Amino acid sequence: MRKLVVGSRRSKLALTQSQQFIDKLKAVDPTLEIEIKEIVTKGDRIVNKQLSKVGGKGLFVKEIQQELFDKEIDMAIHSLKDVPSIIPEGLTLGCIPDREVPFDAYISKNHIPLNELPDGSIIGTSSLRRGAQILSKYPNLEIKWIRGNIDTRLKKLEIEDYDAIILAAAGLRRMGWSDDIVTTYLDKDILLPAIGQGALGIECRSDDVELLELLSKVHNQAVANCVTAERTFLSAMDGSCQVPIGGYATNKENGEIEFTGLIMTPDGTKRYEHTEVGKNPVDLGEAVSRVLKEQGAYEIIKKLNEEQAH
């Protein structure tokens, strides 16, 4: 196998999960020579704005995809939730490896549980999906926008006026943070995860047969089926980070997949949610999106997308 160059964002988390995936490849073939090329994306450069207000899709992947087209790198290791549902022609997701915990972690000062926070308590999150779901269940709380890496957010919780923050559990675990700092993991009934949360997507050129063969050895088809249902739903609903959208699929023991999709208004007042069970992940994602559209969820998305365009 030729020497491989892996493209990664330069955040600590991105580099850590890239290295963890490289270790997985080297476990399959210890002779592999692999180097990481750090790439700065548009999303990394925007630190003073809420991502949902920036607009566009693929804020954390476009520059990396360009390097694949330019043959500067051989593969890209993405957090799958950052990857738009349509992959550009000429590129492919060569593998979906094992998935980390897909849920969100709730971390509060003095470990006060979410349902015991006093009225007006401030929760920090950078995600419309998290904010909307929290407000729908706890309208007495306040959501305040927070950006930055894990260390920065934990520091802000300590020294600023946040009473709690909510982060993806996967990032905390990949970075080696112990469960001790987490007040609780929020299961899907409290906070439905983002599409593809906890999963990685390994992107490469569609015609790179040698690399695709290697990647197939660390591919997890069960996880791929789940995220396919989730990403089909995202695509069918024309979802983006301007929209509070969630989706989570699990494999059932009988070989079927259960998928729940969710669309909300950012203020948490309107909630459209539906669950389907079936064998074909694409059909599942499309079926749930059809039901939510019939219920009127698409009007929320259209309105938010139009507001973004102006």
From Swiss-Prot:
Provide the positions where the record notes the PTM S-(dipyrrolylmethanemethyl)cysteine: 241
GO CC: one term? Answer: cytoplasm
Q: Any idea of its EC number? A: 2.5.1.61
Free-text remark on how the cofactor is bound = Binds 1 dipyrromethane group covalently.
* Keyword annotations: Porphyrin biosynthesis, Transferase
List, in alphabetical order, the GO biological process terms annotated in this UniProt record. protoporphyrinogen IX biosynthetic process
Q: Pfam families annotated for this entry?
A: Porphobil_deam, Porphobil_deamC
Q: Which reaction does it catalyse?
A: 4 porphobilinogen + H2O = hydroxymethylbilane + 4 NH4(+)
Q: Which cofactor does it need?
A: dipyrromethane
- Kindly list the GO molecular function terms attached to this UniProt entry: hydroxymethylbilane synthase activity
The metabolic or biological pathway listed in the UniProt record of this protein is: Porphyrin-containing compound metabolism; protoporphyrin-IX biosynthesis; coproporphyrinogen-III from 5-aminolevulinate: step 2/4
Could you say which protein family the record assigns here?
Belongs to the HMBS family.
The entry's function note states: Tetrapolymerization of the monopyrrole PBG into the hydroxymethylbilane pre-uroporphyrinogen in several discrete steps.
Kindly give any further remark recorded in the entry. Answer: The porphobilinogen subunits are added to the dipyrromethane group.
Assembly behavior: Monomer.
Q: What is this protein called?
A: Porphobilinogen deaminase
From the broadest rank down, the organism's phylogenetic lineage runs: Bacteria, Bacillati, Bacillota, Bacilli, Bacillales
* Gene field: hemC
